[in-house]
Amino acid sequence: MPIAHLPGELEMYYDDDDFSDPWTQAEAVILHHGNAKNGRLWYAWVPLLARDYRVVRVDARGFGRSSIPAPVYQWSLEGFATDLAHLMDHLRIDKAHLIGETIGGTIALQFAYQFPDRLHTVTACTSPYKFRGIATYIDYYNLVQERGVEAWVRQTAHRRLEPDRSDPRHSEWYMQQMSQTAQHVVLETLACLATVDLTPILPRITTPALVLVGEHSAMNTPDRTRSLAELLPHGRLVEVPGASGYVQHSAPEQCVAIWREFVKTAR
């Protein structure tokens, strides 16, 4: 099992897939999952990318198959970004394309701010950039505290994969993956996120940035998507036509096709 032993007592699981021509040096694409998730959720992206890129899927600290900190760990976006930089060092990846989904996209933007020289591009899929003062995250915290992780996951599942637009088996598997996350990790990361607002740093991110969202997603609101792209100096918003829910999971083929075109023009 591929585990990187990294600073901060982190044993970080990752998948590393590269089916590019072996006599070439493929650029790396790093896929970062969201809160209470893991790298498995990116399964559909790998065959669409790995013929031309080295594709690394991470399980962030506390999630999936990576080590779980004891309660009261000091969570922060800066910490997640630093963990990722350490993994890149371990894998000898000097520079990469970074793609994050939901909170993974928020982390990706933080990484672009902290480590601009290590990225070719950054992509945020269905990702918020402002949490402070938004009651939704406090409501999520209370739900997880009172009823547990699985209750929260199932009660909010329709936001990720809309029932009438997705395979119910996909949705069930998705919920099972999320429900494995330790309760204290979900609570503590939600509490951390409730203090986050990336607004001050976004105008200072110089990396070419793609903001992806489903055309019919409940997350496709001007204050979440259009404003994010406008705050980024080199930001581009693409609403995936006809897509709903969390577009990175509901329409992976469309997302990858859009991303490939974005990378061509970003060079």
Go through the PLM ranges and name each one.
Residues 205, 211-213:
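Short beta-strand/loop motif that positions the catalytic acidic residue
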Residues 132-135, 147-204:
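Conserved alpha/beta-hydrolase catalytic His-Asp/Glu region
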Residues 33-35, 96, 100-102:
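Conserved alpha/beta-hydrolase "nucleophile elbow" surrounding the catalytic nucleophile
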Residues 215-220, 245:
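Acidic catalytic loop of the alpha/beta-hydrolase fold
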Residues 106-114, 118-148:
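Flexible "cap/lid" loop of the alpha/beta hydrolase fold
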Residues 234-267:
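Catalytic active-site module of serine/aspartate enzymes centered on a nucleophile-bearing elbow/loop
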Residues 78-96:
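Conserved acidic catalytic loop of the alpha/beta-hydrolase fold
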Residues 10-69, 73:
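Conserved HGGG/HGGXW glycine-rich cap/lid loop of the alpha/beta-hydrolase fold
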